[in-house]
Amino acid sequence: MRTADAIVEILRREGVEWVIGYPVNHVLERGAAAGLRPIIVRQERTGLHMADAVSRVTSGRKLGVFCMQHGPGTENSYGGIAQAFSESVPILVLPMGYARRLAWVQRNYHASTQMQGITKSAEPVTSAKEIPAIFRRAFTRLRSGRGGPALIEVPVDVWNEEIDSIDYVPPRALRCGPDPAAVREAASLLLQARRPVLYAGQGVHWAEAWPELRRLAELLAIPVCTSLGGKSAFPENHPLALGSGGLAIPGTVHHFLRQADLIFGVGCSFTETSFGVAMPKGKPIIHATLDPLDVNKDVACSLAVLGDAKLVLAALIDAVEHQHGTTAKDAGPVAREIREQHDAWLASWMPKLTADDAPLSPYRVLWDLQHSVDIANTIITHDAGSPRDQLSPFWRCTEPLSYLGWGKTTQLGYGLGLAMGAKLAKPERLCINVWGDAAIGFTGMDFETAVRERIPILSILLNNFCMAIELKIMPVSTEKYRSTDISGDYAAFARALGGYGERVERPDDIVPAIRRGIAATERGQPALLEFITSKEVEVSRF
């Protein structure tokens, strides 16, 4: 058996269904021969974003795989790998490498060394017989601990080497439980607190700890907010839901965090970022995380509980029930306060959410979108900048993994690949990306990939003909050189690539256009709806 076939056989045993990539990489062709569907993209970054989403929407039960050629293909891939690393997403990256005799010749790009800073592990194959061990190490790291890309670089002169046999059994995920003493202390602190808040990060998604999070919240009548990455970990139509954090946040999140006397973060890193909610100063914090490197990193904690989010929450529920009993606390008073705060905040935004203006209010577009889709059967993601901040505070998720939030680093154009990868892994769902006229300039050509590969996503494009949030930052550049002016006819662009494209300019046409776009996706055709919007820059910040 040759190296390429051995790699494909390992991928088959690991349950891989798709190999996303760009030629030349022999896994694409040999995988196709073995029944693994190759997905060929127009630019490597989008393919990595697709692999990223496959892992996300399955909580890592299916792992996204991306492969590319050595040299320019690997170099082009850097941004997509870096994005997955910053968001702690496990993906398998399989670049070809230069022949071993040339691998260290300047200036050949050596992925397994150059990408060590943006991967959880990066390893070259120096001998074909080592392939089972190398892949076993990679998949163990992908399934265990904090997520991140694992990279295996296969030199071009290794692909045709022979392997006698494959001794390979897929490794199982490893999970670590918490220190019982820390759990008991955390339970006591939560029971003593008068105004605690639960803050859930994306670790709840990876651990599939949604039932435990809900049980703990209901047992202690604790309001729950999430990070942007953790959004949808707790149903946002629940009486105890506050919504999600981010650069823009609901008024409920601001109110309850500010008044909290204890914040319990679970499955989160508390990383300081411009695109996350800042923890109020001076609050006691319990930090439950899988990664000890996150403890006291950016936010000082009173107590750390290390372990898998599901195991931590299950142990904490047992400890609370042992100390308090199994009867849930009365959630009535806090639920009323949440409802009052939410209603007052939302009322202040209703003029924008229901505006009849032309150009359109982006808030009106997204409000109408939310009320035109089956929320429970939809997966949606934002893009960098205004689309993120205009969408995330107002979109109310009801099902786990129905919102792909991100923000540790914010590459424009990330959302398109996320929606496409989500649709691959969850074809029964309506998968939507919301982006602007800046983001489409980075990855828009891969809308053609969605058409060609029969991935019927719904793409919501907010076009205000400029980089609106840069106007105040670049007044001279704009006045003298129109440097912030960007745009095009993106509905026509979508049609030219074989998709459904429609431009919408009047408020009364928003909902009918959304329905036509959804109908197109149901026929198997990707749809791009281009909404001509105002230069809106106000977001829900406090």
Model-assigned labels for residue ranges:
Residues 129, 165-166, 187, 282-384, ...:
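Phosphate/pyrophosphate-binding active-site segments
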Residues 1-330, 449, 456-459, 489, ...:
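N-terminal alpha/beta PP-like core and its mobile active-site loop of ThDP/TPP-dependent enzymes
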Residues 4, 12-14, 22-34, 339-422, ...:
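Active-site diphosphate/adenylate-binding microenvironment
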Residues 14-15, 66-68, 173-174, 198-201, ...:
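Short, contiguous strand/loop micro-motifs
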Residues 156-159, 386-387, 534-536:
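Short, internal active-site loops enriched in acidic
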Residues 102, 247, 296-298, 304-306, ...:
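Thiamine diphosphate
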Residues 1, 21, 207, 254, ...:
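Conserved structured core elements
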Residues 60, 375-376, 427-428:
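Short helix-loop-beta connector
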